[in-house]
């Protein structure tokens, strides 16, 4: 819908937060440093994996600046991301899930799963 509205609406833009790497970069440059400043003894960072921007951007920053910090993603049952993370391939077709904002039926360009230590299904 948002792509169509951007095409049809004068002066509108489509941000494409799933594949726009500025999403991940913003969290790397801003959110990650803020978290580490506020919690210098952080042991684990847990976040949902939707667009990938938050967890992958913050995760990269934390791995570079506090390598002992674990990064754990949360993904709903029914999303394809858990299988892709655990097995390196898509094992199941996406199913319906009732959690809004996380979980996907495709792998966005913002995903850098190398910064994620573990993933939990909810």
Regions found by a protein language model. Name each.
Residues 1, 19-120:
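Glycine-rich phosphate/pyrophosphate-binding loop at beta-loop-alpha junctions
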Residues 10-12, 69:
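A structural micro-motif
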Residues 14-18:
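Short beta-strands and strand-loop turn motifs
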Residues 1-9:
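PLP-dependent aminotransferase-class I/II
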């Amino acid at each position: 819908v948002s792509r169509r509205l951007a095409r049809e609406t004068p002066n509108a833009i489509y941000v494409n937060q799933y594949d726009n790497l500025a999403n991940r970069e913003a969290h790397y440059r801003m959110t990650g440093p803020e978290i580490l400043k506020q919690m210098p003894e952080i042991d684990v960072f847990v976040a949902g994996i939707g667009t990938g921007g938050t967890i992958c951007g913050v995760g990269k920053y934390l791995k570079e600046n506090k390598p002992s910090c674990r990064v754990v993603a949360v993904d709903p049952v029914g999303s394809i991301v858990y299988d892709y993370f655990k097995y390196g391939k898509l094992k199941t077709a996406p199913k319906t899930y009732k959690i809004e904002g996380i979980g996907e039926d495709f792998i966005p360009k913002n995903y850098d799963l190398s910064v994620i230590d573990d993933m939990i299904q909810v």
